């Protein structure tokens, strides 16, 4: 959903920041999410085999009873191998019915789909998520970059990155804007990817 853009004839490009709340308010976010999943899988099939696609799932979409069949269907109709699909969920998706959530994540993972925890460090952050759920990637929120040139924020960011890496997860830091930030987060080797 984060790359979703609407080219409005009068307003120009409308960003997901504006689209998503309207879709949620109108009860369209699940249908929109399903369309995005299918479209993303089909588009990824046009790309080189080494390239994968990450698709954000809203909490409403993730908690649909048919989420597993929707993912299977998108993979089947597109022909995309499951290992080329990464599903990004936020911490709010992990808050409700944790046993069922764990089961769904485990089944997605057994299909070969990769699971990422997006925007880690905001909202209801809990280190227990890193331990209790079958995640493969943690995406540390851009807010951790604020004041990164001083010791305390950098130590916190590196600590979360090291902990995640030690648990066998890939680590992404979101919101990288300068070479200095990239150098600071890359220094100890825990961060595997940077997202600008």
Residues of each region from the PLM?
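Catalytic core of bacterial c-di-GMP phosphodiesterases, primarily the EAL and HD-GYP domains
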Residues: 1-3, 26-101, 116, 175
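The catalytic core of metal-dependent phosphodiesterases that act on cyclic dinucleotides
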Residues: 3-4, 74-148, 161-196
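Catalytic strand-loop-helix junctions within cyclic-nucleotide turnover domains
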Residues: 6-11, 61-62, 148-150
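Short acidic-capped amphipathic helix/loop micro-motif used as an active-site/signal-coupling element
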Residues: 8-13, 37-41, 119, 196
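Flexible loop/coil segments at beta-strand boundaries within sensory signal-transduction domains
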Residues: 9-11, 46, 107, 178
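Residues at alpha-helix caps and immediate loop-helix transition turns in enzyme cores, especially N-
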Residues: 15, 66-68, 100-101, 126, ...
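Conserved acetyl-CoA-binding loop-helix of GNAT-fold acetyltransferases
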Residues: 32-35, 152-159
């Amino acid at each position: 959903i984060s790359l979703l853009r609407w080219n409005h004839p009068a307003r120009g490009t409308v960003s997901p920041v504006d689209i998503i709340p309207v879709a949620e308010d109108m009860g369209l976010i699940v249908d929109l999410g399903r369309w995005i999943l299918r479209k993303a899988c089909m588009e990824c099939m046009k790309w080189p085999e080494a390239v994968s696609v990450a698709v954000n799932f809203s909490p409403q979409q993730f908690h649909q009873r048919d989420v597993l069949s929707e993912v299977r269907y998108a993979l089947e109709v597109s022909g995309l191998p499951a290992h080329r699909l990464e599903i990004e969920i936020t911490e709010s998706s992990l808050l409700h019915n944790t046993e069922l959530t764990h089961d769904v994540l485990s089944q997605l993972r057994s299909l070969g789909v990769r699971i990422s925890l997006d925007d880690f460090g905001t909202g209801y952050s809990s280190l227990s998520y890193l331990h209790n759920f079958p995640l493969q990637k943690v995406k540390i929120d851009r807010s951790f970059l604020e004041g990164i040139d001083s010791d305390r924020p950098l130590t916190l960011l590196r600590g979360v990155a090291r902990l995640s890496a030690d648990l066998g997860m890939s680590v992404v830091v979101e919101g990288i804007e300068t070479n200095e930030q990239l150098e600071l987060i890359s220094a100890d080797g825990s961060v595997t990817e940077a997202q600008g």
